[in-house]
Regions:
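Phosphate-group recognition and catalysis centered on beta-loop-alpha active-site segments
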Residues: 1-256
Length: 256
């Protein structure tokens, strides 16, 4: 079972940041999940929100600013003064950091009412993944399945992961069209039946966002392929405990 750091390295470090990715790599995580937004100058930056206010304290919309404008903004001090000076990353910078070290789940963000304005997004994203030789270890995800279909049509080489928070049975036509390698359901919609049905079709399951220890254990027993979490350290401990071989003397002593 893979451990996937949500928004990079989990909630103990600035989200979608260089420090977050460095933290994930230092933990030896199998994969990270990051968010990217397209910018006004047709680039991609690591950022979660449509509005920049929560992380930067400034007013503005991510899609309406250039990458240079966004990279002047500080995003670390709201987590801790230890991270003051943390800057927004370009997508290519993140790919360079992760190459050969961890797999990537890439959530593409875009406001629905501006889909027609940003028709270049899927083709450019496909180009970057090809240019950076990142196709084999990157899965592109989105709640916007129309965007995923555009990406799938732009390049069948891109690995698709479907994010959703609804019912599995309502997605069958979209699954047939998108041919995803993974489904990323909300943890509350993740059931043994879903895992079994998806696996029968060769589709991996990665529930999000799982932060409770008991649910981590439950999904591990359920046989999911990985867990997306804000608490990767806790999941590492769980996986290590589960994998620890039983000492013979401990086994004998258990019958006392």
């Amino acid at each position: 079972m893979k451990i996937v750091g949500h928004k990079g390295g989990g909630s103990s470090v600035p989200e979608n940041s260089r420090t977050g990715l460095e933290h994930a790599l230092s933990l030896g995580l199998d994969a990270v999940e990051i968010d990217v937004w397209p910018t006004a100058d047709r680039k991609f930056v690591l950022f979660h929100d449509a509005d920049i206010a929560r992380l930067t304290g400034h007013a503005g919309w991510t899609m309406h600013l250039t990458s240079d404008q966004l990279r002047t903004l500080e995003i670390g001090s709201r987590v801790s003064t230890e991270y003051t000076g943390e800057r927004i990353l370009l997508f290519e910078e993140a790919l360079d950091m992760l190459a050969g070290k961890a797999d990537l789940f890439l959530e593409v963000k875009r406001t629905r009412h501006e889909l027609d304005r940003y028709t270049w997004v899927e083709e450019r994203l496909s180009q970057i993944l090809h240019e950076c030789n990142a196709l084999a270890w990157t899965t592109v995800t989105s709640f916007d399945h129309r965007s995923l279909l555009n990406l799938h049509e732009a390049s069948h080489d891109v690995r698709i992961g479907m994010l959703y928070a609804g019912e599995w049975l309502s997605l069958q036509q979209e699954i047939d069209a998108l041919e995803p390698v993974a489904l990323l359901p909300h943890w509350a919609q993740t059931t043994p039946t879903l895992v079994k049905d998806a696996h029968s079709r060769g589709i991996a399951i990665y529930p999000w966002v799982v932060n409770d220890n008991e649910w981590m254990q439950e999904f591990s027993r359920m046989g999911v392929d990985g867990i997306i979490t804000d608490r990767p350290e806790a999941l590492i401990q769980l996986r290590q405990a589960t994998a620890r071989p039983i000492d013979k003397t401990e086994s004998e002593g258990s019958h006392d």
